[in-house]
Amino acid sequence: MTVESLIQQDETFQNPDYFQVHNLFTVRDLFDARVHFGHKMGSLNENMKPFIFGHRFDTVIFDLDKTAFHLRQALNFLAHVAYRNGIILFVTRSPSSMLMVEKMAIEIGEYAHTRNWETAILTNSAVS
Protein backbone atom coordinates (compact mmCIF):
# COMPACT_ATOMS: atom_id res chain seq x y z
CA MET A 1 0.00 0.00 0.00
CA THR A 2 1.39 3.41 -0.97
CA VAL A 3 1.29 6.62 0.99
CA GLU A 4 -0.96 8.13 -1.68
CA SER A 5 -3.52 5.32 -1.31
CA LEU A 6 -3.48 5.66 2.48
CA ILE A 7 -4.09 9.39 2.18
CA GLN A 8 -6.99 8.82 -0.22
CA GLN A 9 -8.60 6.42 2.27
CA ASP A 10 -8.24 8.76 5.24
CA GLU A 11 -11.21 11.13 5.45
CA THR A 12 -9.23 13.67 7.48
CA PHE A 13 -7.12 14.41 4.40
CA GLN A 14 -10.13 14.88 2.13
CA ASN A 15 -11.27 18.06 3.87
CA PRO A 16 -8.67 20.86 3.95
CA ASP A 17 -9.93 21.98 7.38
CA TYR A 18 -11.21 18.71 8.86
CA PHE A 19 -10.40 19.85 12.42
CA GLN A 20 -12.09 23.26 11.98
CA VAL A 21 -9.00 25.23 12.98
CA HIS A 22 -10.39 28.26 11.12
CA ASN A 23 -12.86 28.66 14.00
CA LEU A 24 -10.14 29.00 16.65
CA PHE A 25 -9.40 32.69 16.04
CA THR A 26 -10.09 35.64 13.78
CA VAL A 27 -7.80 38.32 12.41
CA ARG A 28 -9.50 40.66 14.90
CA ASP A 29 -8.47 38.30 17.74
CA LEU A 30 -4.86 38.52 16.55
CA PHE A 31 -5.12 42.31 16.39
CA ASP A 32 -6.62 42.53 19.88
CA ALA A 33 -3.79 40.30 21.17
CA ARG A 34 -1.32 42.74 19.57
CA VAL A 35 0.25 40.01 17.43
CA HIS A 36 0.92 42.56 14.69
CA PHE A 37 3.56 44.40 16.72
CA GLY A 38 7.03 43.17 15.87
CA HIS A 39 10.51 44.29 16.80
CA LYS A 40 12.63 47.26 15.82
CA MET A 41 13.25 47.85 12.10
CA GLY A 42 17.01 47.56 12.58
CA SER A 43 16.75 43.91 13.61
CA LEU A 44 14.52 42.86 10.68
CA ASN A 45 15.57 39.61 9.01
CA GLU A 46 15.39 39.86 5.20
CA ASN A 47 13.35 36.63 5.04
CA MET A 48 10.55 38.33 6.97
CA LYS A 49 9.95 41.10 4.42
CA PRO A 50 7.07 39.32 2.58
CA PHE A 51 5.15 39.17 5.88
CA ILE A 52 5.57 42.81 6.86
CA PHE A 53 2.61 45.15 6.47
CA GLY A 54 4.69 48.21 7.24
CA HIS A 55 6.27 49.97 10.18
CA ARG A 56 5.34 52.65 12.66
CA PHE A 57 7.64 54.51 15.02
CA ASP A 58 10.50 52.20 13.96
CA THR A 59 8.49 49.09 14.94
CA VAL A 60 7.69 46.37 12.41
CA ILE A 61 3.97 45.76 11.80
CA PHE A 62 3.16 42.23 10.63
CA ASP A 63 0.49 41.51 8.02
CA LEU A 64 -2.21 39.79 10.09
CA ASP A 65 -3.94 38.26 7.05
CA LYS A 66 -0.74 36.41 6.16
CA THR A 67 -0.13 35.60 9.82
CA ALA A 68 -3.62 34.11 10.17
CA PHE A 69 -3.20 32.03 6.99
CA HIS A 70 0.11 30.52 8.09
CA LEU A 71 -0.98 30.06 11.71
CA ARG A 72 -4.04 28.10 10.51
CA GLN A 73 -1.81 25.93 8.30
CA ALA A 74 0.48 25.22 11.26
CA LEU A 75 -2.45 24.44 13.57
CA ASN A 76 -3.98 22.14 10.97
CA PHE A 77 -0.68 20.27 10.63
CA LEU A 78 -0.39 19.94 14.42
CA ALA A 79 -3.98 18.68 14.59
CA HIS A 80 -3.11 15.93 12.11
CA VAL A 81 0.01 14.99 14.11
CA ALA A 82 -1.91 14.88 17.40
CA TYR A 83 -4.82 12.95 15.82
CA ARG A 84 -2.37 10.25 14.78
CA ASN A 85 -0.70 10.16 18.23
CA GLY A 86 2.45 11.78 16.89
CA ILE A 87 5.05 13.41 19.10
CA ILE A 88 5.01 17.19 19.44
CA LEU A 89 8.09 18.98 20.75
CA PHE A 90 7.66 22.51 22.10
CA VAL A 91 10.86 24.56 21.84
CA THR A 92 11.85 27.95 23.22
CA ARG A 93 14.99 29.74 24.27
CA SER A 94 13.11 32.68 25.74
CA PRO A 95 13.62 32.90 29.50
CA SER A 96 10.27 34.65 29.90
CA SER A 97 8.33 31.76 28.34
CA MET A 98 10.33 28.71 29.49
CA LEU A 99 8.18 27.79 32.47
CA MET A 100 4.92 28.38 30.61
CA VAL A 101 6.04 26.20 27.67
CA GLU A 102 7.24 23.41 29.95
CA LYS A 103 4.03 23.51 31.97
CA MET A 104 1.84 23.38 28.85
CA ALA A 105 3.80 20.49 27.34
CA ILE A 106 3.47 18.49 30.55
CA GLU A 107 -0.22 19.37 30.83
CA ILE A 108 -1.00 17.94 27.39
CA GLY A 109 1.38 14.98 27.63
CA GLU A 110 3.96 16.21 25.14
CA TYR A 111 7.60 17.25 25.30
CA ALA A 112 9.50 20.51 25.68
CA HIS A 113 13.08 21.65 25.29
CA THR A 114 13.53 25.05 26.87
CA ARG A 115 17.20 25.27 27.69
CA ASN A 116 20.05 26.53 25.54
CA TRP A 117 21.23 24.36 22.68
CA GLU A 118 23.82 24.64 19.98
CA THR A 119 22.74 26.92 17.15
CA ALA A 120 21.07 25.08 14.23
CA ILE A 121 21.06 21.71 16.02
CA LEU A 122 17.28 21.41 15.64
CA THR A 123 16.98 22.99 12.20
CA ASN A 124 20.09 21.91 10.29
CA SER A 125 21.19 18.29 10.68
CA ALA A 126 24.32 18.92 8.60
CA VAL A 127 25.68 21.15 11.39
CA SER A 128 25.17 18.62 14.19
What is each model feature region?
Residues M1-S128:
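Acidic-enriched and Gly/Ser
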